């Protein structure tokens, strides 16, 4: 399973529809959300980012796929990924 699919599956398994509606409304329905609060979201991919940080190479293909996903959590992941590799 590729990185994008693994992260997507993790987000889908931890989604909260009630929070997703609230988050979308807060952002004036400009984005679709899984409804995962920031602390939980960051915890879900903490180990993944640690592993990526050891590579010392940015996987731009992975980041492009994440950023193109309609769910806002993926765009947050891109920012956190780049910060972790900085």
Feature roles, as predicted:
Residues 1-86:
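Surface-facing alpha-helical segments and adjacent helix-coil boundary elements at the starts of domains
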